[in-house]
Regions:
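Post-signal peptide N-terminal segment of secreted/secretory-pathway proteins
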Residues: 48-101
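Structural signature of tandem alpha-helical TPR/SEL1-like repeats
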Residues: 56-66, 94-105, 131-141, 168-184, ...
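TPR/TPR-like (Sel1-like) alpha-helical repeat modules
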Residues: 176-186, 219-232, 238-270
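Short helix-capping/linker turns of helical repeat alpha-solenoids
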Residues: 33-40, 48-50, 74-78, 83, ...
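Terminal, low-structured helical/coil segments at or just beyond the last alpha-helical repeat
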Residues: 248-350
Length: 350
């Protein structure tokens, strides 16, 4: 969640300069979120999500950006990722110097989540800005993000390898690239990840179903896809437990199928919960067989948050304290002019 969107296929990078293609599978470790900064983040996020359905309401987000900025400056990596996504993709929100702010935020993120920051650097370079770079550096950052354990980078590499393979004639090299692509899809959705790639899990599940006829893998990777927030994982599991995937010979289970249908319907129709939405709690809702089904009230954690009451507004004393600790203006969350503490991390401020 909250990772850069892959660029269009024609803009994607080349693997020509990579010394090796495979990686040693690892994952990124997420530090605990600071509690005080989290109160700012949750307050901003609730209002943010409630402005996303209509572009005409996005301007209402502006007063809440300061909470994201101050939270990010105080080590809240989720606020950092959400804010970078807003700066990159939400043109409906009028934010001056959005590119420089995004770069500064990513420099800060690199101190906590270096693999995620590398993925953002790769995307920034493809869009024409970011760190000083040479041709091919977008691919280098993407590769390093995967080496450092970012599952979305692994998924994007799988897509890149697949794109290269389908352009080749039938033969050994085409098969090699397709096999390697399949491996990276599985890497991206491996159980090692806290936030597996939703799209990567979906592709791995499709391969396990259509090509390998492996029911255990098909269900596992679809569950990982859903854990990563992709409604497509729930759709696949609904079909499997309805008995529609004949290649798998899975015993139909209507209650499991129904729960997956409820989940997929919510995620598909409630697009405003993205990019933050994940379903980390999926095993507490619909564990895979043979585990029995627990009681469930029919709602996801993100759904309870969005539909629940507005989080308490953070006290101005707390906002001012956290802002002062990082040399920020509490009214905007931007660095105060001529503050060396601000320049340490927000290098675009003049």
């Amino acid at each position: 969640a909250c990772t850069p969107n892959p660029p269009a296929k024609e803009e994607r990078m080349s693997t020509d300069k990579w010394e090796k293609m495979d990686i040693v599978l690892t994952t990124e470790t997420y530090p605990p979120l600071p509690e005080e900064a989290d109160t700012l983040y949750r307050y901003a996020l609730w209002h943010d999500i409630n402005t996303r359905r209509k572009p005409s309401t996005r301007h209402k987000l502006l007063p809440y950006l300061r909470y994201y900025r101050i939270a990010a400056a105080n080590g809240h990596w989720q606020a950092n990722k959400t804010l970078q996504h807003i700066l990159m993709y939400n043109e409906d929100v009028d934010i001056p110097d959005r590119r420089d702010e995004g770069v500064a935020l990513n420099e800060l993120l690199a101190q906590q989540l270096p693999a995620t920051a590398d993925l953002w650097w790769s995307t920034y370079i493809l869009f024409g800005y970011g760190p000083k770079h040479d041709k091919g550096d977008a691919a280098a950052y993407l590769r390093r993000a995967a080496d450092r354990g970012n599952p979305e980078a692994m998924y994007m590499i799988a897509e890149l390898l697949s794109d290269q393979a389908v352009r080749l004639p039938e033969g050994e090299e085409r098969r090699r690239l397709l096999d390697l692509s399949d491996k990276f899809y599985r890497y991206s959705a491996d159980k090692i990840h806290r936030f597996p790639s939703g799209k990567g899990g979906e592709q791995a599940s499709i391969t396990a179903t259509v090509i390998q006829h492996n029911a255990e893998d098909a269900m596992f990777y679809a569950q990982q896809s859903l854990r990563g927030g992709a409604y497509q994982g729930a759709v696949r599991l609904q079909l499997i437990f309805e008995g529609e995937e004949k290649e798998l010979s899975v015993k139909p289970d209507q209650e499991r199928a129904h729960r997956y249908e409820v989940i997929s319907d919510y995620l598909f129709t409630t697009f405003e919960v993205y990019p933050e939405a994940t379903v980390e709690e999926i095993d507490d809702i619909v564990p895979l067989p043979p585990a029995p089904l627990p009681e469930w009230d029919g709602k996801l954690n993100i759904q309870r948050f969005v539909e629940g009451e507005e989080p308490p507004k953070p006290a101005e004393e707390l906002v001012e304290k956290l802002a002062a600790a990082k040399g920020l203006d509490p009214a905007t969350g931007l660095p105060l002019p001529k503050k060396e503490t601000a320049r340490r991390w927000w290098n675009w401020w003049d």
